[in-house]
Amino acid sequence: MQPEELFIGCHLSAGKGWEAMGKDALSIGATTFAFFTRNPRGGNAKALDEADVAKLRELLEAHHFGPLVAHAPYTMNLCSAKEETRDFARRALTEDLERMEHLPGNYYNFHPGSHVGQGSDVAIEQISDALNDCL
């Protein structure tokens, strides 16, 4: 990517598959796009279809797309006071980062969460620990 290059895109649905996202982006003249790695309200991610991912990678390369932005679910809270919520967040983060290895060189956007009364120091430590464990 050259510093003067500008990539324009939007958030697209992954519901019809990864190659379909690329085709949707092309149909609107986008040169990048963002997508949720799973349902934005949480839950399990769909099984990854490696052939579908390969087709997307070919499309991205052929049309000189810029970096993509994978977006974590909004329910991911790495600093929740509830252990089960933190466990889901760590699992989702780990799974998403593993999935993004199929699209190297792209971005991963997540909201680290809310400390829900535990205080910023506790939250920062929980987020830091989770990132260190997952990376």
Where are these regions (language model features)?
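N-terminal pre-domain/capping segments
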Residues: 1-72, 76, 80-95
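Active-site acidic/histidine proton-transfer and metal-coordination neighborhood
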Residues: 78-135
